UniProtKB/Swiss-Prot annotation:
Needed cofactors: [4Fe-4S] cluster
Pfam families on file: Fer4_12 (PF13353)
Function as written in the Swiss-Prot or TrEMBL entry: Activation of anaerobic ribonucleoside-triphosphate reductase under anaerobic conditions by generation of an organic free radical, using S-adenosylmethionine and reduced flavodoxin as cosubstrates to produce 5'-deoxy-adenosine.
Subcellular location: Cytoplasm
One GO CC annotation: cytoplasm
Protein species of origin: Vibrio cholerae serotype O1 (strain ATCC 39315 / El Tor Inaba N16961)
Name under which the protein is recorded: Anaerobic ribonucleoside-triphosphate reductase-activating protein
């Protein structure tokens, strides 16, 4: 997996202060997407064990308390990203059980296949659906267009 950007301190992509990872790779390529540079699977940087360790360390950092981890992109549910994302969310839930995990995907909940659904037990909030420019609304909380749905599994 590649990632496009990592923000160890983020107050925009989810509630509270968070760590946010923007992965590379998206098949949806939505018209009007603000993250078009993440569409290619090869864009950005190689995701490594060192990066995963850094995310865990940042989540555990008591100097700057983070509420949780946000995963966006690109698309964390892209088939090429699933193995690395699953490993990361499992590790977060094991080593940082007090942290929540938010994940944004262009797939709807109904469209997820079995391998994508394997992530759901580790996700607290899923924001699903493609960005549809004609339904864009900057006043929406945590989503870009009115068709997108916020699924709160544990929060």
């Amino acid at each position: 997996m590649n990632y496009h950007q990592y923000y160890p301190i983020d107050v925009v992509n989810g509630p509270g202060t968070r760590c946010t990872l923007f992965v590379s790779g998206c098949v949806h390529q939505c018209k009007g997407c603000y993250n078009q540079s993440t569409w290619s699977l090869s864009s950005g940087h190689r995701y490594t064990q060192e990066m995963e360790d850094k995310i865990i360390a940042d989540l555990k950092d008591t100097r700057i308390k983070r509420r949780g981890l946000s995963l966006s992109g690109g698309d964390p549910m892209h088939p090429a990203n699933l193995s690395a994302v699953l490993q990361l969310v499992q590790r977060v839930k094991t080593e940082c059980p007090d942290k929540d995990i938010w994940l944004w995907t262009g797939y709807t909940l109904a469209e997820l296949d079995d391998s994508q659904q394997a992530l759901l037990p580790y996700i607290d909030v899923l924001v699903d659906g493609k960005f549809i420019q004609e339904q864009a609304d900057p006043g929406l909380e945590w989503r870009g267009s009115a068709n997108q749905v916020i699924h709160r599994f544990t929060l």
